[in-house]
Design a protein with these regions (language model features):
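Amphipathic, small/basic residue-rich leader segments at the start of a protein or domain
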Residues: 1-124, 144, 148, 368, ...
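Glycine-rich cofactor-pocket loops
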Residues: 29-32, 62-75, 284-299, 313-350, ...
């Protein structure tokens, strides 16, 4: 295991060249978030996560969580760590100043999120779910709910959860059976939820559950589901902690990964009914919940990149130290990092991680604009970008995080298969990312359906025009940039061909949705890496000698050659449609 180092130079370069931070921080609400301020905050965040949180990763995974006499006990490695996060203000940097937050742009918060996610994926889920609760309450909570709950959740003193899933209601939430019975100014909630991340714990002083339930007499299906706020402890009128509510953890899952995150089965109302408060309109719970879900989906994409960065750093350090075999032109006993195939694997890890990071920051930058830009048209465009990019960030980034983590094990060789190195933990932890907060199959259907077919490809066409604009700006005579321009032109052509094929054959969309999402994800990440490479080339032309800039060009070139080339196969899969799937019946998949 190696020491994690925050890629601060990466963050700074992306803020400059992808986000355009000098203009970004001039938007209303960000007046106190100048570049000078951010340049002071991010190094402090880096120091905290490197020194305090990152060392907990392996130990907390080994310790896991336990349910003892009805009480969830988290890993001893976390003792005092979460409180230090609260004290440092690191739980939610973009929380509203009206409710005790720092009010920083989302692009700064996502940098902090990545630091936490690289440091400890399991712990990162605690503030991640709280952010979703904050988002939902900001949009749909009453003034009383906001005043009672937001400040404590934003600061991390209280945490939040999302309670959707039941044994019979996973992706299909129309089957939710948890009941809500009116009782004066509140409701009594009864039922059971499963797979609730950080559903109960002792690190925060209160746990605020957002719960999907059906009010007595409500319509069947999705149109009869409402959203309720159910606190673990009922706040007193002065905001202090009051009596315990009728909600408790009755089980903890034993999982493949993220062992230090308590994944709970939650029982509501075993002793008469848990007091809950309606959030948003009756029977519109899914609408309210999906505002929280979309926030979580972006966060899972960021989480994949954070884990990928940690896995890459560990694999690169191991390869630089591990001496094995001979390399032409070097003395016997060369570190394996000099072997071409090991270099390939490390570059693959690096390119996928850096591409995903650029995509994540681009999406969050658009989200900032959707809320804060002074121009209504820019706000509208930002909202459109977020809508289109959310399934890509969640789907593509979580898929490649598994690939990166697996390559990390491979670089370690046999030692990667041994738990004590820590490489295996990254692979175990990454496996959940394509599953939770909406499986990647669902993300693919969302992307191809709502983001392409529903508007006839209008939104995606606008995004492709942005890529066309980049192509026009690539005027450098550098051979590397010339090659990148040619490759980007071909990539945009492939995207338009895939979109035209889907629009002409909408019935094939479910069968090709995954290939379609991955094709666009590859293309968009390559585009943003080219933007960074072109900026790096300009710095080199101006006399910069830092190898960081030549590395940006090398990374984009590798992505274009070794990863973007996958799009030829993905495009062919889109062209083939459902033909190969139609050759076999579903029943044949389970018959001998």
């Amino acid at each position: 295991m190696t020491v994690y180092k925050v890629p601060q130079k990466e963050f700074a370069f992306i803020l400059d060249e992808i986000v355009g931070y000098e203009e970004h921080c001039k938007m209303p609400g960000f007046e106190d978030a100048s570049r000078d301020v951010i340049d002071a905050i991010l190094p402090e965040a880096a120091k905290f996560f490197e020194d305090v949180v990152a060392p907990t990763n392996y130990l907390a995974d080994s310790q896991g969580t336990q349910l003892i006499d009805g009480v969830v006990q988290t890993a001893a490695a976390f003792d005092g760590v979460y409180q230090q996060m609260i004290d440092g203000g690191w739980c939610c940097l973009n929380g509203s100043t009206e409710y005790g937050g720092a009010g920083l742009p989302g692009v700064i918060d996502v940098a902090s999120q990545e630091m936490l996610q690289s440091s400890n994926s399991a712990l990162s889920l605690l503030p991640m779910l709280s952010r979703g609760v904050i988002h939902a309450l900001n949009l749909y909570g009453s003034d009383e709910q906001k005043n009672t709950y937001l400040e404590n959740i934003i600061t991390g003193v209280w945490s939040g959860t999302m309670n959707l899933t039941e044994p019979q209601a996973g992706t299909d939430l129309s089957a939710v059976q948890t009941k809500a019975t009116p009782d004066g100014d509140h409701f009594l909630i009864s039922g059971q939820k499963i797979y609730i991340t950080w559903g109960d714990h002792e690190l925060a002083k209160n746990v605020i559950h957002l719960v999907l339930a059906r009010i007595s007499g409500a319509p069947e299906g999705n149109n009869g589901i409402s959203l309720f706020l159910v606190p673990k402890y009922l706040p007193n009128t002065d905001g202090s902690i009051g009596r315990a509510n009728d909600v408790r953890a009755v089980g903890i899952e034993h999982k493949l990964g993220i062992h230090a995150s308590p994944t709970c089965t939650m029982a509501f109302g075993d002793n008469g009914g848990a007091i809950g408060y309606l959030v948003g309109p009756e029977n519109r719970g899914l609408m309210c919940m999906f505002s929280m879900m979309n926030n979580a989906r972006l966060a899972v994409g960021h989480q994949g990149i954070g884990l990928g960065e940690r896995a890459y750093q560990q694999a690169a350090a191991f390869a630089a130290d591990r001496v094995q075999g001979r390399v032409a032109g070097m003395p016997q006993g060369a570190p394996i990092i000099h072997h071409p195939d090991v270099k390939r694997m490390l570059m693959q890890m690096r390119a996928l991680t850096e591409g995903g990071r650029a995509l994540s920051f681009y999406a969050v930058g658009a989200e900032d604009r959707s809320h804060h830009h002074s121009d209504a048209q820019q706000r509208e465009r930002g909202a459109l970008w977020v809508e289109m990019l959310t399934p890509l960030v969640k789907g593509w980034c979580s898929e490649v995080s598994m690939e990166v983590a697996s390559l990390g094990v491979q670089v370690h060789g046999g030692m990667g298969f041994v738990e004590e190195t820590g490489a295996a933990q990254h692979m175990r932890d990454a496996r959940i990312f394509p599953i939770y907060e909406g499986t990647n199959g669902i993300q693919s259907l969302d992307f191809i359906g709502r983001k392409c077919l529903r508007d006839g490809g209008e939104g995606l066409s606008l995004l492709l025009l942005e890529m066309d604009t980049t192509i026009l700006t690539l005027t450098s005579k550098s051979p590397a940039i010339v090659r990148l321009r040619t490759t980007l032109e071909r990539s945009v052509t492939d995207c338009r061909a895939a979109m035209a094929q889907v629009l002409a054959n909408p019935d094939d969309a479910p069968a090709v949705a995954y290939s379609y999402l991955m094709l666009f994800g590859n293309a968009l990440c390559f585009w943003l890496l080219v933007v960074l490479a072109a900026a790096a080339q300009r710095r080199i032309d101006e006399g910069a000698t830092d190898r960081f800039y030549s590395q940006k060009i090398a990374t984009a070139s590798f992505f274009g050659s070794q990863i973007l080339s996958r799009n030829q196969g993905l495009l062919q899969a889109v062209y083939d449609g459902s033909a190969s799937l139609d050759l076999i019946d579903a029943g044949d998949l389970v018959s001998a």
